[in-house]
Structure formats: structure tokens, C-alpha cells
Amino acid sequence: MTGRERREQLISIGRAVFAELGFEGTSVEEIAARAGVSKPVVYEHFGGKEGLYAVVVDREMLALEKVITDSLETGSWRERIEQAVMAILTYVEEETDGFLILVRDAKPGDERSFSTLLNSAVGQVSYILREAFEHRGIDPDLADIYGQALVGMVSTTAQWWLDERNPDREVVATHIVNLCWNGLSGMEVKPKLGGK
């Protein structure tokens, strides 16, 4: 096995172990044993558990960021919402280990975390909403509030669905999109609390 192949093997095994045991529960010894190598091989490639974890998190961040960005690039407003919701739920379903690592095992002080990824998504969604708000006569400066709400709703539901997996992805996506779209389409230009 070449050095590059060994590195990729360790990343793959590390990803699975971090998802299964969490950062704190994972040891270099466990990763090495599952890879069929000695601990010094892991240290040689990554300097330790922290180095391997950083590579795994960075790859997952880039993958999920691309999924979100790609889903928001084209289409009508509704299509973008549908594409983004389906993309995130598909990632949760197909890349469960990666999603688990991002949402359940974030280390304090990490520069790149699920929280920073969500902030980036909020920026993208808010930008799209600003354009839509201008067309509807709604103050575009309020787009950030709605961007936070929409991304938070999708993110929280995706985390819930990670454990539940019922109903299936399409049903969950349909209901998220229904709430997002119909909530946005029925927006009042100057909303008030309590029906005032």
C-alpha cells in the first residue's frame, strides 16, 4: 500500500470510529487496530488523533458546504428551497458518519464547525431572500431574520431525522418545504403580534 493509500485508509477508518465512538471515545490505538497497523503509522501521517480528526472534519465541512451551495445556485425560489432541503437530508442519509461527526462531536474553539457552516448557509439564504423581499415590497434588511429561521428549522429537523429516520426523506422534505414556502408566501409586509 502506498503512503497516499494508507493515509486515505486511515481517514476512512478514523471517520467511522469518530462517528461511532465520538472524539473523546476514540483512541489512536483503536484506529490503528482497525486499520491493521501500528500506532506509529497513525502518528506518522497525522501527528495524533487531533490531526486525523481535523482532516476528517475539514473534509466533511467541505462536502456539506458544497452540497448546500450547489443546491442554492439555480432555480426559482421554491426550487432552491426544495433542492437545499433534499440535499441536506440526502447528505444525512448517505453520509451519516460525517453528519454525526459534524453535529455531535464539535470541539470548542474549532475554526470550522457545523455552526460556522450554518452561518455560511444563513448568508447564502439571506442573500436570496433579500432579492425576493425587494420584489415583494418587504424590507430587505429583514432577510437575515428569515435566513436564520429557515436554516435553523432545516438544520434542527435534519438532526432530529438523523435519529428517527421515519417518515422517509421525501416526506420530511415535503413538509419542511411546505412550511418554508407557505410561510414565506403568506408573509405580511408589516407583521404585528397578537393580531394587532
Can you annotate each of these PLM segments?
Residues 1-5, 140, 188-196:
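N-terminal intrinsically disordered/low-complexity leader segments
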Residues 20-24, 95, 136:
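Short coil/turn segments at alpha/beta junctions that flank glycine-rich nucleotide-binding fingerprints
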Residues 9, 13, 17-51, 55:
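Helix-turn-helix
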Residues 30, 51-60, 102, 117, ...:
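Alpha-helical DNA-contacting segments of helix-turn-helix folds
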Residues 55, 69-94, 147-150, 173:
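Hydrophobic alpha-helical connector segments
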Residues 91-112, 126-130, 159-163:
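Amphipathic alpha-helical segments used for helix-helix packing
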